[in-house]
């Protein structure tokens, strides 16, 4: 938990693939983010716990996606959030969820499952995930967020991987879906591929949802 002591500051929940979120939090401070608390969640089985349903791996012999996001979301809502917020001096002004790559997919998927999160930042989200855009189009959102941030690296479509190469089209489709539902949304295109300045990209998303 990385906290700035301010009256009723927002709390943002961030699943991380490694580390404890310190690098992202430091980038947020460099961007002059308003006071907020960042709760980083590590120790995840990334492909299993952040994927909404089962799916083959992105390349032959790669680890498949386990489709256990619902279980992780239950743990987040039932255990992680209550424990994190019990240490705060006051209840949060609002809650957000953020994520990079597959965690960015999870953050958006959560809007169709719960109304706990009022703002979402998905940086280089894995929106190529098979079936997700259709899932989002065909179902009613449980939450109507106050702001949604999307981003992608400009070179992320330059991949031989057939599953991933349409990620820009999928991200634009998600942007359009939110705009059609009158949800304030932005899509930021960053230089580089999927692995360029990941902490800064995530921090830019958090900054945007904190200031919009």
Name these PLM-found stretches.
Residues 98-103, 107:
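Gly/Ala-rich beta-loop-alpha elbow adjacent to hydrolase catalytic centers
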Residues 14-17, 124, 152:
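The conserved beta1-alpha1 loop
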């Amino acid at each position: 938990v990385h906290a700035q002591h301010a009256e009723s500051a927002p709390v943002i929940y961030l699943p991380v693939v490694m580390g404890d979120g310190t690098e992202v939090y430091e980038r947020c401070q460099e961007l002059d983010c308003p006071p907020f608390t960042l709760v980083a969640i590590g120790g995840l089985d990334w492909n299993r716990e952040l994927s909404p349903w089962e799916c083959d791996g992105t390349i032959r012999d790669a680890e498949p996606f386990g489709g256990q996001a619902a279980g992780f979301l239950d743990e987040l809502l039932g255990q992680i959030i209550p424990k994190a917020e019990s240490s705060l001096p006051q209840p949060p002004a609002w809650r957000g969820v953020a994520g990079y790559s597959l965690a960015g997919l999870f953050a958006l998927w959560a809007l169709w499952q719960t109304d706990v999160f009022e703002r979402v930042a998905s940086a280089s989200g894995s929106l190529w995930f098979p079936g997700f855009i259709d899932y989002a189009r065909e179902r009613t959102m449980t939450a109507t967020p106050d702001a949604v941030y999307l981003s992608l690296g400009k070179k992320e479509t330059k991949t031989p991987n057939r599953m991933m190469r349409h990620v820009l089209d999928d991200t634009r489709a998600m942007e359009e879906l939110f705009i059609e539902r009158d949800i304030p949304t932005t899509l930021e295109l960053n230089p580089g591929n999927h692995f360029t300045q990941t902490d800064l990209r995530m921090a830019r998303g958090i900054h945007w949802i904190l200031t919009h």
